[in-house]
């Protein structure tokens, strides 16, 4: 009796433990789900005044397994303000961060640049000697620390990110370089790299390369450079941007790869809704570390996407970068343990659906979030498809090929290949069948006589007596090769 009771208690305890393990022990405190009123934060003794701005604390719960919130610092560009351009305003949803914050349960910070740097309320990205304790870098790091250390926001210090436009894009890269221990991911929008001056925003100076920027970045990181091993980055720019040199976009990402060190593999280009094309890069461990997005036809602007502002260097007609970059950060975060580091599962169910003498048709099962699929023949990519089917043409007749398929995720790149399938193209010869007497077959060269018996040429199959009274059907399946019967 007692033994049975203890068994029941043990069962109840096991069930309770299983339930508790499936959910965070404490739900994150729900915020108001609205942008705050203007806040006043640390004083900037270098540029003057106090850092002011806004924050968004969502009512939704965080989506990460540890139940902690991500924190995103968003930096406006020159001649912009947080209230007029970044947060929701009379023109729309600003930079369009609110809906993304609700989706992921993330806290968003939108500060105003202190002082009047470069006479246009810019961020001081071109400071040749930035300090973690002074100027714009100092007050921004102080702001991040205020939220990370305030338990009511439940911020995960391993999920702190920064993104910005123009001078804010340049400052994004500065922060990523000088504080890689703070920022797990950065998103640079039309930002000049470290080591450039304000006079060089529109062109790449002679001799300036990604290595130049990487050397600056490493120097600023100092003793924190080891944290680059778990940081991820990306850059986005418009092909009609004539304010900041378009060449700085891929250069920014290349510089960060140099800082991260090791070998990188360029992935397949992936289309993003709104005219964007992303090129992901993976490290030697197969982890996605950088993205490079060019946006066709976009001028110098923050790519807010549908619903965002469409004025004063904010673009609502092209890609939604907040949606892209937040998904990119969450999927590929190397610190929080919540990201996969690469795209989703490889396609399953790859099968050969048809063959001809010059083509092979394939089909496979769809993969969630895949925007396209890569098709590989004998290990080399031969094409891509947005549907779950593909026909590979221009092949050699009577040849066997091996195929695999990958899934391409817009934010994380290409998956591992699927299981391989083999396909053999059909012979180029068109089979024909002839019915005649065995004697006629022998006389026509379709068969031969041996000891009064007719045999089909090639297969040497017996047809019976070689005379006018025995009739056979022979099918020519290849040049000089006949079988008894009709074409297969």
Curated annotation (Swiss-Prot):
Reactions listed under catalytic activity: [(3R)-hydroxybutanoate](n) + H2O = [(3R)-hydroxybutanoate](n-2) + (3R)-hydroxybutanoate dimer + H(+); [(3R)-hydroxybutanoate](n) + H2O = [(3R)-hydroxybutanoate](n-3) + (3R)-hydroxybutanoate trimer + H(+); [(3R)-hydroxybutanoate](n) + H2O = [(3R)-hydroxybutanoate](n-1) + (R)-3-hydroxybutanoate + H(+); [(3R)-hydroxybutanoate](n) + H2O = [(3R)-hydroxybutanoate](n-5) + (3R)-hydroxybutanoate pentamer + H(+)
This protein's UniProt keywords: Hydrolase, Lipid degradation, Lipid metabolism, Secreted, Signal
UniProt record similarity statement: Belongs to the AB hydrolase superfamily. Lipase family.
Ranges for domain Fibronectin type-III: 346-428
Designated name of the protein: Poly(3-hydroxybutyrate) depolymerase
Gene3D superfamilies per record: alpha/beta hydrolase, Immunoglobulins
A family per Pfam: Esterase_PHB
Superkingdom classification of source: Bacteria
EC identifiers of the protein: 3.1.1.75
